[in-house]
Amino acid sequence: MPDITFNGPAGRIEGKYFQAKDPRAPIAVVMHPHPLHGGTMNTKVTYRIYEAFAKCGFSVLRFNFRGVGNSQGEYDNGVGELSDAAAALDWLHAQHPSTSGIWISGFSFGSWIALQLLMRRPDVARFLAVSPPAGMYDFSFLSPCPASGFVMVGDNDEITPSSDIEDLLKKTARQKDVKIHYSKIMGADHFYTEQQEELANKLTQYIMSNLEKAPALSA
């Protein structure tokens, strides 16, 4: 997984990149939790998402938002971070112009950014949102949700109560044929401290079971 840098709106962005052997492999971008609360691309859950995509044959990129690690710039309350995410997806897609499909994903704050990017990129086929902070941020932009995806939370999450996510999903309108799969891991806190393997297994299972269902990009 080589270290890479690419240009973002606030300067250089650092990332970790896994390249699949198949040039038509699907691609995925992974976004980390809140930069001001210790979130980085090396956060355990962020890495687990990245690893799950790689094991499923994706070319995948995780990166540090502006002001984190060696990424240039300063925290921008989600606005600049969304621009960073768009730049990351553009970079990855440029490496794989023949990709069979695009997925985006994130953990906590990163899932809020990922879902905003989903609304701006009709070429995204599916999403993974791990512990989206539904009670802390406005997710009303998600209605109607344009793509199918997977939402996961721990039932002991002290930051994102599962009830907040369940309320969000009930209120979220969906376009025709869009399905959002919801999974709750019993006993898990926000960081899945004792449930890392279960988290990884559920992510991998969802990805593998939906690979063929993601619409292929037109040539």
Predicted features, each with a name:
Residues 172-191:
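Catalytic histidine neighborhood in serine/cysteine hydrolases
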